[in-house]
Amino acid sequence: MIYYVNNSAPKNGNGTKEMPFKFINDAAKIAKAGDEVLVAPGIYHEYVDPVNGGTEDARIVYKSEKPLGAKITGAETMNDWEHYKDNVWVCRVDNGVFGNYNPYTTMVGGDWYFAPVVRHTGAVYLKDRQLYEAETLEECIKGEVYAPSWESEWSVYKWYTEQDKEKNQTVIYANFQGKNPTEEKVEINVRRNCFMPSKTGVNYITFSGFDVSKAATTWAPPAAYQDGMIGPHWSKGWIIEDCEVSNSKCCGISLGKYYDPENDHYFTRKHVKSPTQMERDAVCRGQYHGWTKENIGSHIIRRCHIHHCEQTGIVGRMGGVFSIIEDNHIHNINNMQQLGGAEISGIKMHAAIDVVMRRNHIHHCTMGIWCDWEAQGTRLTQNLLHDNCPPEGTPKAEGAMMSQDIFIEVGHGPTLIDNNIMLSPVSVRMATDGIACVHNLMLGSLTAVGGGTGDRYTPYHIRHRTEVAGFMTFLHGDDRFYNNIFIQNYPVEETETVEDMGFKMEDNQEVGTHVFDEYPTYDEWISHFELDKPADMSKLEPYHNKCHLPVWVNGNAYFNGAKACVNEKENLMDNENQVKVELVEKDGHYSIKTNVYEFLKDFRTGIINSDILGYAFEPEQRFEDPDGSTIIFDQDYLGEHRGVAAMPGPFADGAEAEKILW
């Protein structure tokens, strides 16, 4: 059955084409497996709470009749402003409009939140852009530049809020820098979510073609309920496609964790156990709460435009397993720098088990992709990442995170990074074990090698399942680097030891695989175990618990002073020619202008496959597809065939770099 929704209808109907519903949520209350909800263009000021799920063979489809024509917003228009002082205006809102959730009394904060807890989940928007929240009315009146902002010219637009308890009103002051808010498009967010079931287990929903914006979402760390403007809420088989997602206070789309009252922001509330311990507990408790391949995950997020959210574009802990995230454009995430903590990125996934992220364009984010804990069977492929770093000279905000294209943290692999274009100053931060980098172009460094893990021990899982197989600390290594291009594109400053999230790591800026010079080859490592003799537990204890795992490096090309690992036998090292790489944007399309292929000349390497990469050490799982099949790396960034020999980097032929990459 098709239900029709049109908020321009003269009155609320029964969902027929002749008498459509005025609200999407009216259809969401009754739609059942196999039904379609067709939504006419218009602005829908509502929270949609789907009651029923579909089945694998009979999905429930919510579709905008015109692509991006149906707009679901968490905000309300605010025109009732009075001039207060200088450029500052004031409005009052009766708190009844907020129901049981007032964004202007709810603070952003919780586990793994490092910035001062001074921001609210509420927001003021001028022409679809968030204003900066001030801590005091005086700061709002001054309207000065917020130095850590990545968009400093916009940071002079401020707002400040307080409560009038006698009148039960929220009072909002805003500095519009000379603009008259009664004549401009000004909104305030009032709803926490836009399209997300309030209960778990609402499966097999397709959400297609909507413009979703301006919700008062909350901080979403791994051992807590993770909400977004859109999200399946601990269910299976959703498709979120062809949507525009913007201006969430925290997260745009959540594939995240359910609410567990016994382990929700436990560290923040009780202090007596570390947030790391509670993350381990969350994994174990998830097994009890239905976290299996049969029940959870297997979602698809595709062809979405996600931007200007202040925590993540996409977030997920455990609920996103076995998912595909493809063909999305994600940019300008956390650019305001008013929120800070360990959960900020274009995509931030914990337990990305068998998750494939491919053909995404991610830029101008604090981080591009962050796979934290249990990146087992995770594959990042054919992504374009650039400008995931602050503007030059921008000071770091209190609680802000370091920047890079990809961060893999405290997982045991196998984590596969292949055929990507990484153009930011740091390509991969790797405080982890079990990574394979194959056929990438990297202009930035490999950093945090051998550090950033502390004494944490994290789970690994039964192959291609969620069930926990074991826990282990980090020996570091167990990494592979084949057929990559490394170019020292940015100036090098002296390596320094930095502390982030309480964990120390080397912040290396030199490009190349030389950071693994002290790591053993496989033959060196295996020789310690004396396989021809009886096992001696005390003698082997250091090699079980303290020594690095082996690293495999071969077939890479190095330019502009990028350095190779001492154990690499076959490579191309060119320190004579000056290689240039320029990302060219024209009419919204991107290509690369480079001379690197002039100097690669006839250097070729072998075709890599899953058997060459082998097995990640702790889970004893091969670098393979989620269905267990072999990967042969004979397709490049654009899907072109490589043939019997391979050129290093993401292209089968150098001429492809000048083609449209996005």
Can you describe what each PLM-predicted range is?
Residues 203-216, 236-250, 260-286, 292-312, ...:
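Right-handed parallel beta-helix
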